[in-house]
Each structure stands twice: as structure tokens, then as C-alpha cells.
């Protein structure tokens, strides 16, 4: 179960599938969150120069480290606020999106991720359905309408 990585030692390349998102906020639909962290750590432990993510531009290890650092930070920040009794909405509002992460697209995915983390932390304050997640995203002003002129912003040629 889960995602597949393709490691090509001779070329010092790893293909990450949906484990890595570069230039856009990553999203995890089901946990546990710790598996995502472990998968990123596994990728970064490989003897590679090139990481080909499932979403976004091709990067070196620094780009992969950036994503790993973000998902660890997001978990830690969500846990602090969960333990303090904050709501899902207030938690998302309070988490500082630092540079260069603040330039990433798909910021609305923070709600999905924090909601999953709230479920893992015990469930208090987590919403139950994707429709509920979308309502929180809309309430926080995180859902931007997509226009046809924006095209595909995930680095894939469809």
C-alpha cells in the first residue's frame, strides 16, 4: 500500500511519485503523517543528485529537504495548537507560512493537511468530509477560482 519510488543508482536519480511536491503545497489524504515523513527521509538518504517529484519541477536534495522541513514544521505547529485547544480554522490562520513556502501554490491544502493531523491527534475539531474541508477553505479565503488562462500549474504536460 502507498506510493512507489523508482531509484536509478547509475544515474543518481529518484522518481518520487506523489510523495514529493515541489513549488506547491503538498497534500496527504490519508495517514499516518509519520509515513510521509519517513518516505521523504528515505528519499533524502539515497545517493542522488536529482529528485523528480510527482508534482512540480525537478530539484536536487535541497528542494526535497525544503518539503520535508515544511511537513515536519506543519505537524509540530498543528500539534501545539491542537494541544492548546485551538479550532481547525484558528490553527490554519495562526500557522506561519515562511519563505520560500509562502510562494508555493495550492495554499488551500494546508486545511486538508491540518485536518488529517487533527484526526491523528485524537479527532477533536477535525471535520468529517471533504465538503466540510472545502467550507473551511472558503471561509478562510484560501480557495481561489481557477481560470482557463492559468493552465496546468502542477508541472505536468497533459
Describe each region flagged by the PLM.
Residues 1-80:
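Metallo-beta-lactamase
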Residues 86-158:
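C-terminal regulatory/interaction regions
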